Every structure is written in structure tokens, then in C-alpha cells.
């Protein structure tokens, strides 16, 4: 069982007011935050903390991760005419964002050559 604690008294003053997660089954403690000597997420044997007094901190446990499968699809929905107009009148489309090789980019930030390339690759007559 995992218990959240705040150390209230310890021989090592760097531990006072630090927060930990205690794993009773493994006899380990995971540092949530401490003033010094311990890094966030560092796991140590409980015995390494020495003589301590603590108060329990309520933990909000979330259910385990449920994997349902599925896929992710990213679609650009626009017309060729919109991109061509954005080339001619960039001031009309300051927020026009497109996907290029998996990255989001402002269409107006592309060079004219890159803009033509995007239009050519995005809108084809046949597969």
C-alpha cells in the first residue's frame, strides 16, 4: 500500500517538511519534494530516512490506465484556393496553421518556394 507523508521531525533537518510516498510492500520511499540531499522521484530504502515522525497526507488515487487502442488522425481541412489566396494576401491569414511533416507551422512563415511546394503536395489531381 502506498501512503503519502510529510515528515514533521527528523534527525536530518533537510528532511523536515519534505513529502514522500511510502511503499509498505517494498519498504521504499519516493521523494516528492525535499529541501536538500534528495532529488524529486528519488527512491530510497525507508531505513535511509532514519528516525522520523510524520503526518499522513491524503492521496487521491486514480484508476489504472485503460488502453482501448485506436488511432490518431490529423487532418488539414481547407481548399487549394485558400492557400493560394494566403500566398497573395498573407495579411488576411495571420493565424493560418498547417501541418508539415508532423509539425504545425504558420503558413505565412514559410518561404514562397515552401508555400508552393505545400500547395503542390497537398492538392493533387490523382493518387
Swiss-Prot record:
Q: Which GO terms describe its molecular function?
A: formate C-acetyltransferase activity
Q: Where is the Glycine radical domain?
A: 5-127
Using the record's annotations, give every residue carrying the modification Glycine radical: 102
InterPro entries attached to this UniProt entry: Auton_GlycylRad_Cofactor, Form_AcTrfase_GR_CS, Gly_radical, Glycyl_radical_cofactor_GrcA
Provide a GO CC annotation, any one: cytosol
Q: Which UniProt keywords apply?
A: Organic radical
* Task performed by this protein: Acts as a radical domain for damaged PFL and possibly other radical proteins.
Name recorded for this polypeptide? Autonomous glycyl radical cofactor
The record lists the organism as Serratia proteamaculans (strain 568)
User: Taxonomically, what lineage is the organism?
Assistant: Bacteria, Pseudomonadati, Pseudomonadota, Gammaproteobacteria, Enterobacterales
Q: What gene name does this entry carry? A: grcA
Amino acid at each position: 500500500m502506498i501512503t503519502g507523508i510529510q515528515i514533521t521531525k527528523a534527525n536530518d533537518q533537510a528532511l523536515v517538511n519534505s513529502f514522500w510516498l511510502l511503499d509498505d510492500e517494498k519498504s521504499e520511499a519516493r521523494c516528492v519534494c525535499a529541501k536538500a540531499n534528495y532529488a524529486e522521484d528519488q527512491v530510497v530504502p525507508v531505513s535511509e530516512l532514519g528516525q522520523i515522525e510524520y503526518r499522513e497526507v491524503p492521496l487521491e488515487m486514480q484508476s489504472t490506465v485503460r488502453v482501448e487502442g485506436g488511432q490518431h488522425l490529423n487532418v488539414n481541412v481547407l481548399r487549394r484556393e485558400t492557400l493560394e489566396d494566403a500566398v497573395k494576401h498573407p495579411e488576411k491569414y495571420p493565424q493560418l496553421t498547417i501541418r508539415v511533416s508532423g509539425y504545425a507551422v504558420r503558413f505565412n512563415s514559410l518561404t514562397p518556394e515552401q508555400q508552393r511546394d505545400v500547395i503542390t503536395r497537398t492538392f493533387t489531381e490523382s493518387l
